């Protein structure tokens, strides 16, 4: 979500179009709004993407030792020992991961697990938007 003011372009929330692409097309730098600033734009509620189950963002391997009955959402080629798991993209394709994110959250939320574990993706391109959604899902 972007907006404009007298100083230029403002990025309110990362989405499918990477920040760098907006800057390239417009030829202008894009300012990002601080997360603590209250903005009246769609999707800005802190828990906008929150499933019913608790979502924990961290190191999956470490967190699996703490949570016995956990569902796991992960990215890339990992050997995860969990009954309920969803790989956003085995090939680390951010576009594929973005397309799978809400299905993953929904399926893991509907599982018999007590908690959903996930890690943040690379902070580049669509990874920023995916991480934003994961962080919102983790807010309770």
Label every model-predicted segment.
Residues 1-140:
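Active-site-adjacent structural elements in enzyme catalytic cores
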């Amino acid at each position: 979500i972007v907006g404009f003011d007298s100083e230029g372009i403002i990025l309110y929330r990362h989405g499918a179009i990477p920040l760098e692409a907006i800057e390239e097309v417009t030829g202008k730098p894009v300012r990002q709004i601080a997360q603590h600033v209250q903005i009246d734009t769609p999707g800005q509620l802190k828990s906008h993407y929150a499933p019913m189950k608790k979502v924990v963002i961290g190191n999956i391997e470490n967190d699996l030792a703490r949570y016995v009955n956990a569902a796991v959402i992960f990215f890339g080629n990992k050997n995860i020992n969990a009954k309920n798991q969803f790989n956003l993209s085995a090939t680390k394709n951010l576009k594929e991961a973005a397309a799978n994110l809400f299905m993953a959250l929904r399926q893991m939320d509907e599982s018999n697990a007590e908690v959903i574990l996930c890690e943040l993706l690379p902070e580049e391109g669509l990874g920023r938007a995916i991480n934003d959604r994961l962080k919102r899902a983790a807010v309770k």
